[in-house]
Amino acid sequence: MLWAVVGHSISKGTTNFVPVKLFVLGRPGSGKSEAYRQIDKYIQQSHKNWSVIHFTDYEILQEMFQFEKYFQLNEKLRKFQPREHEGFDVRDFSVLDDVLKELEKKIRFRVSNVCNEQLIVIEFARDDYGKALKLFSPNFLKDAYFLFINSDINTCIQRVHDRVAHSSSIDDHFVSDDIICSYYKRQRIPFKLERVDFLNSNKVQVITTKMHLINNKGSQQDFTKKINRFINSIIKHEEQEKSSSILGEALTQWGHNHILVRASKLRMRAVSLLRN
């Protein structure tokens, strides 16, 4: 009886699909976009029941830059500085906070109706990731995974120049040496991100400890293996969680059905006794 209920739960798909969020963090040129491309390739090959959606803050920043370029005539009020290769530097870093808030809205809108197993890859670069991640709502960060890709400044700069010279993707945009050596010089990584609950200022809510670090200093093959291994661990964990959830729902349903059956039998017995 119990396993029949479990089978019914699985066939009916009683567990709702909840997208899994993966934040991919690191300096420009560290390998974030390359990591996404490998994630997408690996999932298509090895986990065909999953799909991947990619979000970056750069698209929003670029839209803001283009709008300012044509409509903000007052040079002093401009928040972006045009650079070579159709790139730009951020002059007013407050826009970086605004962009992340807008990014959350964009993601929530796009993934409001999920009909399969889905991995949401969210990519951005900052100097202080603890501060940046606190701009997202706690519910949005709940159960998310975090991948920080580490690479030294000189390597990042060289990769940026190489990708601009030999562009093969829309993600191959230019970032100036100046901004990499100044704003992105330090990388603060929150291995334990905490937020004060404003309804109770004495309470601290732990948001996540799921921060994984990969050093992208070796060969492309080595980097690929690290990415595949990490993604496989995420999917394995999520599928185990889903199986546990389905079993829990089945047990609850079985218990409910069992009580109804017993109640029905007792009622029939009582009616029989009254008639006698």
Report residues per predicted region:
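The conserved Walker
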Residues: 28
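Conserved phosphate-donor/acceptor-positioning beta-strand/loop module used by diverse small-molecule
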Residues: 123-124, 140-160
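Conserved glycine(s) of the Walker
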Residues: 31
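NTP-dependent small-molecule kinase module
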Residues: 2-3, 188-276
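Extreme N-terminal, non-catalytic leader segments
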Residues: 2-21
